Curated annotation (Swiss-Prot):
Transmembrane segments: none annotated. The modification N6-succinyllysine is found at residues 455, 505, 554. This is Bifunctional epoxide hydrolase 2. The modification Phosphoserine is found at residue 370. Homodimer. It comes from Sus scrofa. Phosphate binds at residues 123-124.
Amino acid sequence: MALRAAVFDLDGVLALPSITTSWARAEEKLALPRGFLNEAFKKGGQDGSVARVMTGEITFSQWVPFMEEDCRKCAEDSGIRLPENFSVKHIFDKALSEKKINYPMLQAALTLKKKGFSTCILTNNWLDDSAQRGSRAQLMCELRPHFDFLIESCRVGMAKPDPQIYKLMLDTLKAEPNEVVFLDDVGTHLKPVRDLGMATILVRDTDTALRELEKVTGVQLLQTPALPPTSCDPSALSHGYVLIKPGVRLHFVEMGSGPAVCLCHGFPESWFSWRYQIPALAQAGFRVLAVDMKGYGESSAPPEIEEYSLEVLCKDMVTFLNKLGLSQAVFIGHDWGGVLVWNMALFYPERVRAVASLNTPFMPSNPNVSPMEIIKANPVFDYQLYFQEPGVAEAELEQNLDRTFKNFFRAHDETFLTTNRVRELGGLFVGTPEEPSLSRLVTEEDIQFYVQQFKKSGFRGPLNWYRNMERNWQWGCKGSGRKILIPALMVTAENDLVLHPKMSKHMENWIPHLKRGHIKDCGHWTQIDKPAELNRILIEWLETDARNPLVDSKL
């Protein structure tokens, strides 16, 4: 029978360095004999303190004194003296603080899952009440979404190598033994697995283990292209609603803890456009709030054009922060969301911890030139003139939502659309296929999510963002001459045909602390076109420029 399930140990397999490697480093530093800590650990035995901590009978902090005593006994038996600064707690704290995800092994698990394998983490673990418990919690939060099942010894009251925990694993997977491969870095944990009839791999180093895993599964795992970042399942997220004023609410999804990061999408999109960024930013230690902007999805879509002026939209976002009790947030925007976040930084700098825009440059209002003059002078913006007459573009875009989104969400080398001569042609989709093919950027499920969202909201609200050019210009002129002095990031996309990188050329004149990121071979839909590259740029910038300073209560 073919293998259809893969089970991974945590320590020494999915997370490195292994505890034994950390012990060896501690032994060297403390001038203890090699293997000393492992011998002391074994003294706890399957019937002693180790079994009690691994099965959740006692916590880590309760177990530490037992390990201290076992170390003292081992030292006496070996005729050595423990250093004065010897501390089991410090050794384990250090080991946990150093532990990182073994990404090649994780990618192998993801590849197998994509090929139809069920995946499971089976780990001997303790109830962690130590000073480093946050590190362990973060590690588990990062790994858990990638696996179908997680079995922790301290949660089920049994631990490896007890055969009962492997039988529980088989029941959980609903698999026969000969359908499962199990990877562990401890040989004694594998013997009962083999006795039950499962395939086993003893992990000494990652490359060798992956070669063995390739061989037994028949799936290529080495030298494979990196898988895209994890996407969001809308049904598995926390959804929230903030009442901005009577009749107007903003919907958002939320993930993570830490400094708040508010994600603002563009046209014609949804919070779902950030589906590859939300988990990555949350795992990096941020509280992510991805908003359905006004007019979209489950947020309110009032019909009045003036409801979508930048002045009103920014006031809405300030109310959004107030209602959530947030004094500041990092604002990251794309397309129209980029315009919004630059204006938040310009008019409400005290509420913006840092600001970043994808594709959309900061373009200060010129009191001497109206925006309509600029748009009319640039043929690539003709579509915006087509959007001005209420009801016209709505009729075209709402006629066949499946066609609409398959036309919009395309890579730069797949596009059917032209943004110039739209009025002359009589519409944005004139000359495009009635049944467009699916772009490589999206799945059919992605398209249907947008279809369902716009069945709720329609296109009037989203198009009203374009119908406030004069109001936005007049408001923007009130900030004429101001500079944006807060931490800022501009991410350009090489192949965005409308928001071309050259448009951001002079931004440093207005934003002296501006940092930049540039993504090659990327079109307009940056978040889904190059999600891994974007996530790397955003996380590096957030870590250096956007961590919240300590705030003292004023009460």
